[in-house]
Amino acid sequence: MKTVVILAGLVALALSSAVPPPKYQHHYKTSPVDAIFVEKQKKVFSLFKNVNQLDYEAEYYKIGKDYDVEANIDNYSNKKVVEDFLLLYRTGFMPKGFEFSIFYERMREEAIALFELFYYAKDFETFYKTASFARVHVNEGMFLYAYYIAVIQRMDTNGLVLPAPYEVYPQYFTNMEVLFKVDRIKMQDGFLNKDLAAYYGMYHENDNYVFYANYSNSLSYPNEEERIAYFYEDIGLNSYYYYFHMHLPFWWNSEKYGPFKERRGEIYYYFYQQLIARYYLERLTNGLGEIPEFSWYSPVKTGYYPMLYGSYYPFAQRPNYYDIHNDKNYEQIRFLDMFEMTFLQYLQKGHFKAFDKEINFHDVKAVNFVGNYWQANADLYNEEVTKLYQRSYEINARHVLGAAPKPFNKYSFIPSALDFYQTSLRDPVFYQLYDRIINYINEFKQYLQPYNQNDLHFVGVKISDVKVDKLATYFEYYDFDVSNSVFVSKKDIKNFPYGYKVRQPRLNHKPFSVSIGVKSDVAVDAVFKIFLGPKYDSNGFPIPLAKNWNKFYELDWFVHKVMPGQNHIVRQSSDFLFFKEDSLPMSEIYKLLDEGKIPSDMSNSSDTLPQRLMLPRGTKDGYPFQLFVFVYPYQAVPKEMEPFKSIVPDSKPFGYPFDRPVHPEYFKQPNMHFEDVHVYHEGEQFPYKFNVPFYVPQKVEV
């Protein structure tokens, strides 16, 4: 046999011919909209195009260039907000071209002032004019941050579609190696040597240049963490985290802006507990074991080299065994340690009393205070001290673990992955930090009375059977547009002839259904919950439920009316509540708008996880998990919370019945069922085998 060395680019070329069309071209759920909605939507979209430069012929520029905020002060419902903004703006706002991060004090102060200016505009026209003014005159990153939140939070923009963050900020979702290739093609005006281009995974397809992209390797993850780089760097997962912040920023004051004050801290805990549980499942199937722990007084073992760049500087790098306890961090380390110890002292006392609050830690509602404490959000303090975010545990921890030097001034800093919600999930130490926070909150959970048999029992209702289709994951190619990363000429900005797309394999799963047999003695509205949890730990030993309760990941919640006798309920994975379809590209949304339609999930469920990440990547022989199905009586939310049923679906705690430590003997009741399942993986186990790096020739036996 002779060995033929085949260039990886040619392998990629062969693979590209077998790539199925992106699935967004088929069967995407849409909703009809009227002409007024379409006009609003197109105006909102126009401000996202080529965000790093201005179009002097665009409508927004003509409006924003000369718009006078002060002269229009009567068009804002809160005049003090306008005055506060103008005071900051005239003393000097953040210049254009600088990197923006909400985790730095002066930038945060300006961004909140800008958001409030957007938020208190009396009508959509004033909002659009104000946003146009900011698009022209304000720092690009700050504008986008405030604009995203305002579109989500304003009543007159409710339901409008926002572009996927990875289209707006490609530099935060794509390694610099790929964007360098994009810039090269742009600078060469599309000139391509076909042989050389194939070698580097670059192709011209129709009106687009397509760039094959791997996930980061051991250069970025100098440890075994590269095994799940496809998870860390998934553009849908990172967008999900960004949207979570957009819907409920840590600086958000519920008294001032809106709802959820009574459950805000609970939402914080539930979000991170579920994110860590989902991450843990991915670690198990990849043989990475338990989530590592760290100490503020010892080197951090897990290094990370982001391979990302900001406006002027590359992202900071953290080597393995990074010594965080150094002279630039002493003060922050002391604060972080004191913050943790103070919380444990509160728990030992059993109560907290300060900031006009008195909390009993034996009360289940205390979770709201505990979540607020760890987020250090605006609802924790009274009105006089709501801006004490510099005393935030999260912000200080991100700065210490990010390993960046101290900022040069209020606007100049070396960015780290932990400085942005769009990039935080790429850094493995992020999960170690939030696992640490969740473990502290679980210390509080130990003070809660576990559910007893009567709490969990459903009189007259029994789950007789649960059947689950084969669970199988696979990797598939997906294209996403990175055209916003390039600068274009004045001539081309109106109608640039080409688009730039990155093609990358992403984790997905085959559709499946869960069939539930229920025998009932009564006719009643019942809630069904489906969870996925580990059955064995990283060493292969069964995990007792008493130690495993907070590792169950909630897949679905739905209400079904059961009738006397035998009931057969089939739930399709595509209908699971906590997931959505992937975002459509802006180019596809424009086509839908011309037909009077919008993508339903992008309009209604932007803050949920993509369906394709529902299951952890399986293994060839099937990785064992357990599916938990639970049915209980439905209790509607209070009337005042009905508009928010998508977030607060019923009156039970988030994650119920796994919202507190459990007594396993009470989880063997007729209205509960544990079903052993296996998650298989079909095709290549590791996505980098789809796109072999160009610098590694492949040997093929002939």
Swiss-Prot record:
PROSITE patterns: HEMOCYANIN_1 (PS00209), HEMOCYANIN_2 (PS00210). GO terms for molecular function: nutrient reservoir activity. Residues 1-16 form the signal peptide. It comes from the Eukaryota. It is found in: Secreted, Extracellular space. Fat body. Glycans are attached at N75, N214. Keywords: Glycoprotein, Secreted, Signal, Storage protein. InterPro entries: Di-copper_centre_dom_sf, Hemocyanin/hexamerin, Hemocyanin/hexamerin_mid_dom, Hemocyanin_C, Hemocyanin_C_sf, Hemocyanin_N, Hemocyanin_N_sf, Ig_E-set. GO terms for cellular component: extracellular region. Its main location: secreted. Arylphorin is a larval storage protein (LSP) which may serve as a storage protein used primarily as a source of aromatic amino acids for protein synthesis during metamorphosis. It is a constituent of the sclerotizing system of the cuticle, and serves as a carrier for ecdysteroid hormone. Belongs to the hemocyanin family. Arylphorin is a hexamer of subunits alpha and beta. This is Arylphorin subunit alpha.
